Amino acid sequence: MSKTAAQPRVGLYPGTFDPVTNGHLDIIRRACTLVDRLVIGVAINADKKPLFSLEERREMLEAECAKLSVGGEIVVRPFDTLLMSFAQEVGAGIIVRGLRAVSDFEYEFQMVGMNQKLDPGIETVFLMADPTCQAIASRLVKEIARLKGDVSHFVPAAVEGRLKAKFGVS
């Protein structure tokens, strides 16, 4: 597909981002090389009981994305609908997903099958996690922070500060 000014390539990177990690930012940076506009969909998922509010997660993402040197546009938007409905709403032709391990692939493979039934015109693109980010998972970062461990290798400094504030760590 060729780039045209009339039809920019729009990608959607959905997730909970509770909190945003260096792994997420690596995928965002690399996804921006594939599309003209990347929409980061911050999922409202009550089942996950996030540590950070939707507004806090959106703020962290916007602040960290503003620091990235990318050529395309990045937009952060919350969503609480079906992923494919949201993708259609934002005009995304590509859904971007990061893969860290085989277990990620098994889950994502099932999701692609379902999503293709809902809208076969939207492709899913998988980006392998950078080797330096393969072990990073938001839930593990939160657990390490809760136990007063060092998360500086896994999240940006501002996010580390917010984690420390949440868990009362100085």
Segments from the language model and where they lie:
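Nucleotidyltransferase catalytic core that binds NTPs
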Residues: 1-170
